[in-house]
Design a protein with these regions (language model features):
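N-terminal pre-catalytic "stem/leader" segment of glycosyltransferase-like enzymes
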Residues: 1-128
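Catalytic core of nucleotide-activated saccharide and alditol-phosphate transferases
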Residues: 91-174
């Protein structure tokens, strides 16, 4: 199974570090299960073992828990646009729909909505309304009722709860 994982890898004023626990732990889990068949087209550099100590020191929490957990990467990140058009991937996952919507129109035009997933791990209960209206599966971490969003009720059939994860290699089994 081929999975295209779309997420940002650039710092901004709004997001000054790369670490995003929901996004990162989901990608770590997918990579653990499916290896190189998961292509993070915008490579999440801080998750890979070659991320430098100097860079690590700039991450939220100094990279504790999620950084440098992927030891190898044989993912083919070339010709992503062409691969989307040719439906090369079985699924397309947006790891943080608020932070990165790269290739979104192309994905929506070429993939069945059942093959697209949006993940919203932000610390608020608000939705990206435009994305919610796309009618794809929308995983939401902070999922609780808000009367200010009652106008979105018809779209809630696509919304599912999601929780944080934890990297398997950080769990002490003994």
């Amino acid at each position: 199974m081929k999975i295209l994982y779309i997420s940002g890898n650039q710092r901004s004023e709004q997001f000054p570090w790369l670490t995003d626990y929901q996004d990162d732990c989901l990608l770590l889990g997918l990579k653990e299960l499916f290896g190189g068949d998961v292509v993070d087209c915008n490579k999440r550099f801080h998750l890979y073992s070659d991320y430098s100590d100097e860079q690590l020191a700039t991450e939220y929490g100094r990279g504790f828990t999620v950084c440098r957990n992927i030891t190898s990467d044989d993912a083919d990140r070339e010709d992503i646009t062409k691969k989307i058009r040719n439906k090369y991937f079985d699924y397309v996952i947006y790891g943080s729909i608020w932070r990165c919507q790269d290739h979104l129109q192309l994905v929506l035009e070429n993939y069945d909505k059942k093959k697209i997933v949006f993940v919203d791990g932000e610390d608020t209960n608000t939705f990206d309304e435009n994305r919610l209206k796309d009618g794809v599966v929308y995983f939401k971490r902070e999922l609780y009722p808000d009367q200010k969003q009652v106008h979105l009720q018809e779209y809630m059939q696509h919304v599912l709860p999601i929780s944080f994860a934890f990297p398997t290699n950080k769990v002490n089994a003994g």
